[in-house]
Regions:
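Charge-dense, helix-prone N-terminal extensions
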Residues: 1-139
Length: 139
């Protein structure tokens, strides 16, 4: 789980702190949580409900272990191979938050350091997920 924290903490604007509910580490961007890692093998990530539904349908994540009807997802890290999946989900959450911040504030969160199109291409997101991003973008 240290690899997850060290990677996510390098993304522009991300702050890392203690997660109060259940222990672990929490990642925030502009004061809003983009996910947290529990001490065990569990990563929880908040999404807009539409994005969450796409991720569940694509079997990228599971419904949240405590709040299955919310926008949150859970992802279990059982081995080193699962770290990549956790990072993929956290990156999607980060990028979605950047897009919503840019739309709301009409500002470039992270400056030019975050190229949303290039990042989504690199993640190889599905058409459905890309459509969800496009719906909230500044046009």
């Amino acid at each position: 789980m240290n690899q997850i924290e060290s990677t996510v903490s390098e993304w522009p604007g991300v702050e890392v702190g203690s997660h109060d509910r259940g222990g672990g580490r929490e990642f925030t961007l502009d004061g809003r949580e983009i996910g947290h890692v529990h001490r065990g093998q569990l990563v929880d990530i908040p999404f807009a409900k539409r994005v969450r539904d796409i991720l569940i349908e694509e079997e990228r994540a599971e419904k949240h272990h405590v709040m299955p009807d919310s926008g949150w997802v859970s992802y279990r890290v059982r081995s080193d191979e699962d770290i990549e999946g956790a990072l993929w989900l956290l990156r999607v959450a980060y990028l979605y938050r950047v897009v919503t911040l840019r739309k709301r504030e009409e500002t470039q969160v992270g400056g030019d350091a975050v190229d949303i199109d290039a990042a989504l291409d690199e993640l190889n997101v599905s058409d459905a997920l890309e459509d969800a991003f496009n719906e909230v973008r500044v046009v």
